[in-house]
Amino acid sequence: MKVIVAGAGTLGRRVARYVGEKHDVTIVEKSRERCASVTEEFQSCGNVRVLRGDIDEPAILLEAGADRADVFVAATGHDEDNLVGCLLAKNEFKVKKVIGAVRNPRNRWLYNRSWGVDVALDSAQICAHLIEEEATLTDLVRLL
């Protein structure tokens, strides 16, 4: 499986580390410094490649292998970049599964199929659901 991870922050690196154990991963990162540190971090992992560039540029996505990618994960620190990357991955390169990481919960509503997003990762929403489930479970235990 070919996976492109946009953004080499904490989430992007974790995804690349986990998926890179068994699959071909390309990390696309805009920052020169972060590219250097991530390249060093992943030098022993033969399945992970680091490419410096901006995911808003189709030529960079093509160089990353978006035309043959199975999964695209937009995990930059900026919703605008994530959404444009998702849109390009889905519409220009026909990537099968596009995942976008929501940075600002107010922008959650944008992460949908019209922007090319198949799955929206919203950590605030995930935490809220977990808290609600815990509260519900605690209430149920008290009733018993």
Task: Show the residue positions of the predicted features.
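Cytosolic regulatory regions of ion transport systems
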Residues: 1-144
